[in-house]
Amino acid sequence: MKSSKQLVQDAKDYRFNPAIPLRIYLKTCIGILEKAQCAFQANDLSLSFIYYFRYVDLLTNKLSRHPELLRMDASSSSSSSYIHKREYLQLIKLEVPAVCKIIESLRTQIDSQYSKLQTSLANNIAKPNINANTTPVQVEQQPLPKKSFDEYSFNQSISFFQKISNAQLNTGASSQSQATARDEAYRLNYPELPRLTFST
């Protein structure tokens, strides 16, 4: 749902071409008024507000500067353009004030519904459940064990990887005794991994 200010912007969003004859615009105004009344009867307040506002805006702001209205004089009282000017003036005098009252009534209804919807949406937003009795859980972080560099373990690891790579290069001599010796070297010289301790 939109507010009345947003609907006014929607109602003013149309093109006006002064080259179109005045009689066409007068028929268009009548069509806009009929659409507004149909939307109001269908209980579509937003759409009826847009059509009523567009009707008033077209008559008062756009058609008042139409070239056919500006170049008419009283001497051409028998021409069809004079009849269109009189029809335009009747719409301005008789219908526009009544439509303005309808617009104001619709504006109050739309703004009331819009504010109710906004407060309803604001009340339905989830809020954090803060209980005074609960205390936040504090996670204690255990310090990592301090271990300095052990040169002996490092050298042992390097020699282990060298033996493995040399054993893979010597694939030609793969007797049973070499395989068991390599397995024995693997078990004896595997680098020592740091021990993880978990406090409970």
Swiss-Prot record:
Subunit description: Interacts with BRO1 and DOA4.
Family of this protein: Belongs to the RFU1 family.
| Gene transcribed to yield this protein | RFU1
Instruction: Spell out the subcellular localization from the entry.
Output: Endosome
Keyword Membrane assigned to the entry: answer is no
The GO annotation for biological process reads: ubiquitin recycling
Q: Which domain of life is it from?
A: Eukaryota
Q: By what name is this protein known?
A: Regulator of free ubiquitin chains 1
Q: What else is known?
A: Present with 377 molecules/cell in log phase SD medium.
Which keywords annotate this record?
Endosome, Protease inhibitor, Thiol protease inhibitor
Indicate whether Endoplasmic reticulum appears among the record's keywords: no
The molecular function terms of the Gene Ontology recorded here are: cysteine-type endopeptidase inhibitor activity; enzyme inhibitor activity
What is the protein's major site of localization? other
Query: What do the Gene Ontology cellular component annotations say?
Result: endosome
Q: What does this protein do, in the record's words?
A: Inhibitor of the DOA4 deubiquitinase involved in the regulation of protein degradation by the proteasome and maintenance of a normal level of free ubiquitin.
